[in-house]
């Protein structure tokens, strides 16, 4: 499983609840459910609240959402945190150090701590200073900000063009290596 942004939130949930997911790459995602409830069979995870008053608007009118969401570490939000310790395989967190959309580094560190507290050592984080939120395959153009439905303003994704491009190249190599190490021969595990 490879996923990015809100998709990484869903991808991490799938890793926790679906035994078929045996290796997971989460690119700038979260370790909990935000915005809308997550429903799977009889399970319903309520989202961690967001705080519109925490949205920051820069001089050009673009929105920074980095501090907009509630904190998964708060006791009242624990029911929304994914049980990453239940995942069936390793998890690789790819993090942009200049992510303006999510507090991705904190989310990844929280998930890794959770894995370790349950005796798991198969989680790993790769941090790319200067990379923004949308770390995609190499040579895709960097998107510093874009219009997003419902905001009525551009949303900042972050990233320095040179550092972001380098991160995309390096991250892609690491992702391919991760999947080669963890998926080759995994069909026999199902």
Task: Please provide the spans of the model-predicted regions.
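Primarily recognizes the serine-hydrolase "nucleophile elbow" in alpha/beta-hydrolase
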Residues: 1-53, 64-75
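Loop/turn elements at helix/coil->beta-strand transitions in domains of secreted/extracellular proteins
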Residues: 19-23, 88-90, 121-123
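Short, solvent-exposed loop/turn and secondary-structure capping segments
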Residues: 36-39, 104-106, 137-138
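Active-site nucleophile elbow and catalytic-triad environment of alpha/beta-hydrolase enzymes
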Residues: 65-83, 97, 108-110, 160
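Surface-exposed acidic, glycine-flexible loop patches that form ligand/cofactor-binding
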Residues: 80-86, 185-189
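Short beta-strand/loop motif that positions the catalytic acidic residue
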Residues: 87, 93-95, 99
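Acidic catalytic loop of the alpha/beta-hydrolase fold
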Residues: 98-102, 133-134
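C-terminal catalytic histidine-bearing segment of alpha/beta-hydrolase fold enzymes
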Residues: 109, 113, 117-190
């Amino acid at each position: 499983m490879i996923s990015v942004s809100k998709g990484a939130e869903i991808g991490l949930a799938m890793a926790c609840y679906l035994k078929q997911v045996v290796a997971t790459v989460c690119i700038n995602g979260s370790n909990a459910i935000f915005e809308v409830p997550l429903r799977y069979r009889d399970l319903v995870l309520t989202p961690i609240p967001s705080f519109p008053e925490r949205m920051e608007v820069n001089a050009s009118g673009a929105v920074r959402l980095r501090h907009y969401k509630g904190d998964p570490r708060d006791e009242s939000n624990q029911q929304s945190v994914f049980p990453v310790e239940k995942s069936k395989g390793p998890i690789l967190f790819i993090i942009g150090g200049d992510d303006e959309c999510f507090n991705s580094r904190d989310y990844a560190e929280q998930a890794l701590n959770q894995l370790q507290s349950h005796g798991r050592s198969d989680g790993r984080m790769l941090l790319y200073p200067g990379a923004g939120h949308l770390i995609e395959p190499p040579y895709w153009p960097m998107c510093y900000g874009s219009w997003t439905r419902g905001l009525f303003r551009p949303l900042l994704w972050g990233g320095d063009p040179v550092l972001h491009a380098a991160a995309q190249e390096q991250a892609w190599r690491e992702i391919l290596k991760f999947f080669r190490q963890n998926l080759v021969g995994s069909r026999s595990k199902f």
